[in-house]
Swiss-Prot record:
It holds the Pfam family Pan_kinase. Substrate binds at Y100, G107, A108, D109, R110, T184. It catalyses: (R)-pantothenate + ATP = (R)-4'-phosphopantothenate + ADP + H(+). Homodimer. This is Type III pantothenate kinase. One of its GO terms (molecular function) is metal ion binding. Its main location: cytoplasm. Belongs to the type III pantothenate kinase family. It comes from Solibacter usitatus (strain Ellin6076). It is found in: Cytoplasm.
């Protein structure tokens, strides 16, 4: 069994794979000062309720954009899973040629999304990952990671609006019934929702004009399913894209690993 961890700024998403099949998924908060023992006990306690045997974990792959917790996660995997985790980085064999000016600057999650987008949907493609930031990752038809855009995330926008104004309430992100809000909450939700869509569609329009009209646009991440409902360019929502990309990279680097039928 493969354990795949995507450590982001706000959450850590964890997936258990049997071959290429995702059999269970969990989401935990990213806690910078959590110890290896706390992480290990927390992860081990997830398995039994899911009906999984932790002793069957024989591989762990991690993509992380949170350097302060990398060494803690590495030690945790050694102590509690008796294996050395594979960390995805710019020198990992991911099956894409990285065309970024400085490959060391590319977040591991962006590379992983590029792999999953290209090998699941073909190129050219652009993956839009909506997390703490909104990342646009572009892959050519030849399988080259070209780069993309990084924009402010929806959660950051909500927090900034709430913290920098005296009378505006903090609201949940949701699709409003109408673009014209008839109360303060509805007006804020309209601005957040259609503002995000306008930004995303504006960037995608320019990306598609550069990569070509055959470009596939794939959405993943927290609020992506709501954005797809209103976007002109995003028609595909893939909830597990990042975890599947991690599994693909593991499989590429461990061809001897058993595959699902």
């Amino acid at each position: 069994m493969l354990l795949a961890l995507d450590a982001g700024n706000s959450n850590i998403t964890i997936g258990a794979f049997e071959g290429s099949d995702l059999v269970c998924q969990w989401r935990l908060r990213t806690v910078h000062d959590q110890t290896a023992d706390e992480w290990g006990i927390l992860l081990r306690n997830l398995f039994s309720p899911a009906g999984l045997d932790i002793r069957r974990v024989d591989g762990i792959i991690i993509s992380s954009v949170v350097p302060p917790i990398d060494s803690t996660l590495a030690f945790m995997t050694q102590r509690y899973f008796h294996t050395n985790a594979m960390f995805v980085g710019p020198h990992t064999d991911i099956g894409l040629e990285i065309r970024y000016d400085n490959p060391n600057e590319v977040g591991a999650d962006r590379l992983v999304n590029g792999v999953a987008g290209f090998y699941k949907y073909g190129g050219p493609c652009v993956v839009v990952d909506m997390g703490t930031t909104i990342n646009f990752d572009c892959i050519s038809a030849a399988g080259e990671y070209l780069g993309g855009s990084i924009a402010v995330g929806i959660g950051i926008s909500i927090n900034a609006l709430f913290s920098k104004t005296a009378r505006l309430p903090k609201v949940d992100f949701r699709r409003p019934k109408n673009v014209i809000g008839t109360n303060t909450v509805a007006s804020i939700q309209s601005g957040l929702y259609y503002g995000a869509i306008g930004m995303i569609d504006g960037i995608l329009e320019r990306v598609i004009s550069q990569l070509g009209p055959e470009t596939k646009a794939i959405a993943t991440g927290g609020q992506a399913h709501m954005i797809v409902e209103g976007s002109r360019y995003l028609k595909t929502y893939d909830e597990h894209l990042t975890l599947q990309g991690l599994q693909m990279i593991w499989e590429r680097n461990h061809p001897e690993a058993p595959q699902s039928e």
